[in-house]
Curated annotation (Swiss-Prot):
Tissues showing expression: Expressed in flowers and siliques.
SUPFAM superfamilies: Histone-fold
Top-level division of the source organism's lineage: Eukaryota
Subcellular localization(s) per the UniProt record: Nucleus
Functional summary from the UniProt entry: Component of the NF-Y/HAP transcription factor complex. The NF-Y complex stimulates the transcription of various genes by recognizing and binding to a CCAAT motif in promoters.
Pfam (any one): CBFD_NFYB_HMF
Source species of the chain: Arabidopsis thaliana
Family annotation (Gene3D superfamilies): Histone, subunit A
Name recorded for this polypeptide: Nuclear transcription factor Y subunit B-5
Record feature DNA-binding region, as residue ranges: 56-62
Cellular-component GO terms for this entry: CCAAT-binding factor complex
Annotated keywords: Activator, DNA-binding, Nucleus, Transcription, Transcription regulation
GO molecular function terms listed in the Swiss-Prot or TrEMBL record: DNA-binding transcription activator activity, RNA polymerase II-specific; DNA-binding transcription factor activity; protein heterodimerization activity; sequence-specific DNA binding
Quaternary state and interactors: Heterotrimeric transcription factor composed of three components, NF-YA, NF-YB and NF-YC. NF-YB and NF-YC must interact and dimerize for NF-YA association and DNA binding.
Amino acid sequence: MAGNYHSFQNPIPRYQNYNFGSSSSNHQHEHDGLVVVVEDQQQEESMMVKEQDRLLPIANVGRIMKNILPANAKVSKEAKETMQECVSEFISFVTGEASDKCHKEKRKTVNGDDICWAMANLGFDDYAAQLKKYLHRYRVLEGEKPNHHGKGGPKSSPDN
């Protein structure tokens, strides 16, 4: 939905067991205002979203940045890390919008058409138009049929 911004930067993990007791051996963590008490180290480690699972590989981000810049340009570690955060957040933002659409349509698979729709719905119309052209060319080259039924997902997909 245009205008509704989601933040996926630090998603709250789904906790199975809350223990709001005050045992001194417990560890307390705060996630967006929610204090969660963890009973042991193993449970604590399983709840944390690993940074490498949340972010694109920094080497890939750096390589893309270097390809855009003049050959003699340098990119600082801070610039790579900042861009890594930005692009990872952007991907989560667009994918979340596409996923919401699929959920409303009772589909499990997010496809390229859903991503194009999400980009346009979020106000990135120019990018969505170019992405649609690219997706069409990709499908032609791969021998796939373009999606023209308007729902955003292929009719023959087994999980739709």
